[in-house]
Amino acid sequence: MNLNFTSPLHPASSQRPTSFFIEDILLHKPKPLREVAPDHFASSLASRVPLLDYGYPLMPTPTLLAPHAHHPLHKGDHHHPYFLTTSGMPVPALFPHPQHAELPGKHCRRRKARTVFSDSQLSGLEKRFEIQRYLSTPERVELATALSLSETQVKTWFQNRRMKHKKQLRKSQDEPKAPDGPESPEGSPRGSEAATAAEARLSLPAGPFVLTEPEDEVDIGDEGELGSGPHVL
């Protein structure tokens, strides 16, 4: 009987027992992390980070930064000041939505449409204005009914017509008056005298002339009475 007492075979440990020697500490260095190219990291991050309409990325939401996603039914009781909510950062729009945009003439007073009167209506209004500048309410109603107009249209027309009339009066008063010139030659005595003198000047002959005194009148009688000699005038 062969009794061989052999010690049980223990698998040789490939690992050296840990000790506090410097050699053992330096032997078990932590493995360096695998280097990742920056371009690969940027592309992978850009695919997970949403972009705004104008090209600037938002900060990643907590669901992207957290290693383990939260349960959808679980809501956080607090918000970290340096993290954004799941809805992202509220960014105001650069241009307002056309539906909510303020219209340019919203607060401005809308201009009313101008009323166009017919020739017969204008003629009736002008005739009444020549007679009466101001109308009472019953008179306006009566005139509006006769001309197929509303009371407001008649009232507005009379107001504008009075303003136009006042402007015309003011313009006529501001215009300088022409200075009073000499009266016409026919209507004034000086003019008649000047005309007579002009006619007399035209009837005179041209050149110098001498006025002579008239001779004494001589009665011609009988030849004997005058004498025998010749009589010289």
Curated annotation (Swiss-Prot):
One Pfam family linked to the record: Homeodomain
CDD domains in the record: homeodomain
Biased composition range(s): Basic and acidic residues: 171-180
Protein family (similarity comment): Belongs to the distal-less homeobox family.
Acidic residues compositional bias, start-end: 213-225
UniProt region (Disordered), positions on chain: 160-233
Protein name: Brain-specific homeobox protein homolog
UniProtKB keywords: Activator, DNA-binding, Homeobox, Nucleus, Transcription, Transcription regulation
Assigned GO CC terms: chromatin; nucleus; transcription regulator complex
UniProt cross-references to Gene3D superfamilies, sorted A to Z: Homeodomain-like
Major subcellular site: nucleus
Function comment: DNA binding protein that function as transcriptional activator. Is essential for normal postnatal growth and nursing. Is an essential factor for neuronal neuropeptide Y and agouti-related peptide function and locomotory behavior in the control of energy balance.
Organism of provenance: Homo sapiens (Human)
Basic residues composition bias: residue spans: 161-170
InterPro entries reported in the protein's UniProt record: HD, HD_metazoa, Homeobox_CS, Homeobox_TF, Homeodomain-like_sf
Domain of life: Eukaryota
GO molecular function: DNA-binding transcription factor activity, RNA polymerase II-specific; RNA polymerase II cis-regulatory region sequence-specific DNA binding; sequence-specific double-stranded DNA binding
Residue ranges for the DNA-binding region feature of this UniProt entry: 110-169
The keyword GTP-binding appears for this protein: no
GO biological process, one term: eating behavior
Compartments (UniProt record): Nucleus
SUPFAM superfamilies: Homeodomain-like (SSF46689)
Keyword Thylakoid: no
